[in-house]
Amino acid sequence: RYPGTAVARFLARYTAKLAPTALHFEAARKLGFFDVSPRWKDFSYELCLDATMAMSTAEGYYPAWDGMLMKRFDSFIPDKIPVTIIFGDTDRTLPATTCQERSVAPNHAKWIIFPNTGHAPMWDSPLDVIDEIKKTVALAS
């Protein structure tokens, strides 16, 4: 039942008061972000603190997770609605072997795997994510 990020949620929730000081140290950033990203060392203090505080106060975290369990593309999505699915090649939260099922996505979906990118592509590959969003929006116009 627990998501792959349950440990991160637990750590964030119970260390939130320490985070503003602790995240100045590489060991604390590694503890919180090593499993999320291969580029965790490049993350700014602000990104780590914002993510930690958001995770620690997200009361809807488990209800949202529960709501997504076993949810798939379960109804027809017309070809005129562009669908882009982005994963990182080192995503340990939703690994390719168990969670990236192309067969359940619409046939017309564009499937992208960013290299050297973890569970949060917007952190690891922000410019690439922006580019793909722009391309997808252009298709919808």
Locate each region found by the language model.
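Short glycine-/acidic-enriched loop or helix-start segments at secondary-structure transitions
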Residues: 1, 95-97, 123
